[in-house]
Every structure is written in C-alpha cells, then in structure tokens.
Swiss-Prot record:
The lineage of its organism: Archaea, Nanobdellota, Candidatus Nanoarchaeia, Nanoarchaeales, Nanoarchaeaceae. HAMAP family: Ribosomal_eS6 (MF_00512). Pfam families: Ribosomal_S6e. This is Small ribosomal subunit protein eS6. GO terms for biological process: translation.
Length: 126
C-alpha cells in the first residue's frame, strides 16, 4: 500500500468559520494521535495555538470515524434515514502513515489573531 508523504492539516476557526490548509512533509509527529486529541500548533507554524483533531481521510479517500478503534479500514452500517442503512467503508480513529488529510479546530488561540494568519495564507496562495 502506498504511504502518504505529505499530510494536509486543515485548521478551522469556530468563531469566524474560516479555514486554512497547511501541508507538512514530515507528519511522523502526528502518528498515533486519535480523533479528539489536542496537538500543538507551533509544529505547523501556529505559535501559541492548540488544535483538536476532529477527523480526516486516508489515502483512498475513506473518512475517519471516532467509533472505529485503530488505524484500520472497516465496513460499518451507516444510517441513511430511520428505515434505511447501508454498508460503508471507513478508516479508524488513529492517525497513521495512510492518512493524507487531518481536520482540526482551534481550541486555544495564540497571540497572533487568526484573521491575520488567514489573510497571510490567502495572499500567499494567489
């Protein structure tokens, strides 16, 4: 199975609803972390920020689920509505070398306002 060499970390601000996407080429420090764990934002250039992992997706595009333990793919029953459910493949709640995207939300803000960081990322992107 091919392994992910670059991991995209999506940082969302719950106050403004805005998000930035940061790529890290050395994601080994993330391995073993689970959905719900907090990580230090200084490792991705967000000094003073604390981020909570809320989800992600693996190299094949399967979403991570908090209920599925470990770094594995499983088929689970997914409720579509009250009367119908389907089997869906999902990835477990632990980050491994097969994860390509990690979704996070800010739980503690740093000294630099997120609005300023957001504007810097937008101007660098263009």
């Amino acid at each position: 199975m091919p392994k992910a060499s670059v991991v995209k970390i999506v940082v969302s601000d719950p106050k403004s609803g805005k998000a930035i996407q940061i790529e890290t080429k050395e994601p080994q420090w993330l391995y073993g972390k689970k959905i719900g764990d907090t990580i230090d934002g200084s490792k991705i250039g967000l000094d003073g920020y604390e981020l909570k992992i809320t989800g992600g997706s693996d190299i094949a595009g399967f979403p991570m689920r908090k209920e599925v333990e470990g770094a594995v793919r499983k088929k689970i029953w997914w409720w579509v509505d009250k009367r119908m459910r389907v089997k869906k493949t999902v990835y477990g709640n632990t980050i491994s070398d097969e994860i390509v995207q990690v979704n996070t939300v800010i739980v503690k803000y740093g000294e630099k306002p997120f609005e300023e960081i957001y504007n810097e990322f937008k101007s660098n992107k263009q």
